Amino acid sequence: MGAALGTGARLTSVPRIACSSLRRQAPSAPAQGCHSKSGPPRPVPLKKRGYDVTRNPHLNKGMAFTLEERLQLGIHGLIPPCFLSQDVQLLRIMRYYENQQSDLDKYIILMTLQDRNEKLFYRVLTSDVEKFMPIVYTPTVGLACQHYGLTFRRPRGLFITIHDKGHIATMLNSWPEDNIKAVVVTDGERILGLGDLGCYGMGIPVGKLALYTACGGVNPQQCLPVLLDVGTNNEELLRDPLYIGLKHQRVRGEEYDDLLDEFMQAVTDKFGINCLIQFEDFANANAFRLLNKYRNKYCMFNDDIQGTASVAVAGILAALRITKNRLSNHVFVFQGAGEAAMGIAHLLVMALEKEGIPKTEAIKKIWMVDSKGLIVKGRSHLNHEKEMFAQDHPEVNSLEEVVRLVKPTAIIGVAAIAGAFTEQILRDMASFHERPIVFALSNPTSKAECTAEKCYRVTEGRGIFASGSPFKSVTLEDGRTFTPGQGNNAYVFPGVALGVIAGGIRHIPDEIFLLTAEQIAQEVSEQHLSQGRLYPPLSTIRDVSLRIAVKVLDYAYKHNLASYYPEPKDKEAFVKSLIYTPDYDSFSLDTYSWPKEAMSVQKV
């Protein structure tokens, strides 16, 4: 071993994907933006040793390090004298996980694993995405955010406050990774259906980016979660001694806007104009405004508006295969008129226009109910978004009355009002139409407009149901069993992000979210529809995300949105070459020898 080191040995890692600081196996297609062919992988020195390796979640393998690796990395003796495969480590984690009584405890186990061993964390998630998604994201992540101060273990992500204005570029330089391709940012004002959680909202960007990798295969080292802390108006948090954020009322107005402007500019200055920035859980007052302000200037989108719209429209398009008619034959009533409702409505209008329906006629098919009743022309204090969908109709106060008058084919709940779809509403829907569409999309489960069981029972199994949070299968008295579809945004944003990153897309038009919806709907088989599913099983989500990414990439090149040239001939192979794998890196010595005469020792 000593002789090997003396002949030019370097400690390296054998790579498995591109864009990593470690040496990995060459991908089937190059991951560089130029798309040029690369030669054989060259050794890259691994500079970390000892505790710096075992405490680095990107490098740590726990007891999966071989004896040779332990000796060369200076960690022999720092790990128990046992050698485990990743499969055995997975089994060990699963046994401990299954012994936990609460979902919050399970969440904590997974997050601490992510902090300790990133590869094993994603091996666990990808082993059963359907099982773990409700834990790492909705609905459990909402509970985790509410208890963030109590469960806080280790900082993850970048916390930028209103007091850091003027210095955001410096703060970004503190982040240990330079090759960031995706940022998820929130200001914590509207976390799921739970309201203002301030700094506790960091759990959302962390959870979203975990799904970027688990569902889409985006390299986690290229992802950055960000919390913009401008204060909180949640009095309970302001009184909480465990609260980890700024303890003052939210800063608004020009100072807030200046912070956002500086943040967007600093991110693109540091990581490039192609860096994807996903806005998450901003309040209605800011969500639309910031989307309209930045969408044509930066590579960004708002998941609550555009992601929710895409997954909801995907469910509706799949439902058309059950109702056996066209989108233009349907009338929609929304419970809620916030960012999610408006996003869905706008994308529905686009889909209707694609069917040949004029925009003015398409808008007439969409009725919205907010806290003050039906949105109608002439009603005071309507913002620009609501004015677009205001109907020429007398005022109506309740959702039940609107449903009776309009007789919609579909009702869509996105207002986080638990139980809003009453038995009377469901009975009316079932009496109006043979196959009524009922989407209870609010998160978390406690905020759902109705349960799957209630919908199927009241409509005698004729309701076409989808929800935002997961519900178990329902068996009716006649023996029929339905498996409700979950309209989870995770069907959308990982694939879109992967496609955007792959093509270096500068701006993300709404057409990308419509083609994503169409692709998701195509993934639903007739067997799934017969079971009540409007979405493909979550177990297939990585394959779905890959096909979405390829569609996005193809659209980008056809419409001159991509910035990487030349265009890859085999887009699927190219995207596959970028996908992160949770397989462990193999650390090895890069050994070689000089010619004997070159190594001869000179003597006096």
UniProtKB/Swiss-Prot annotation:
Disordered: annotated span: 28-50
The record's free-text note on cofactor binding: Divalent metal cations. Prefers magnesium or manganese.
Residues in the signal sequence: none
Predominant subcellular localization, coarse grouping: mitochondrion
EC number: 1.1.1.40
Cofactor(s) listed: Mg(2+); Mn(2+)
Molecular function per GO: malate dehydrogenase (decarboxylating) (NADP+) activity; malic enzyme activity; metal ion binding; NAD binding; NADP+ binding; oxaloacetate decarboxylase activity
Annotated site location: Important for activity: D304
Listed SMART domains: malic (SM01274), Malic_M (SM00919)
GO biological process: malate metabolic process; pyruvate metabolic process
Record CDD domains: NAD_bind_1_malic_enz (cd05312)
PROSITE patterns attached to this UniProt entry: MALIC_ENZYMES
Positions of post-translational Phosphoserine modification: S371
UniProt record similarity statement: Belongs to the malic enzymes family.
Protein name: NADP-dependent malic enzyme, mitochondrial
Encoding gene, per UniProt annotation: Me3
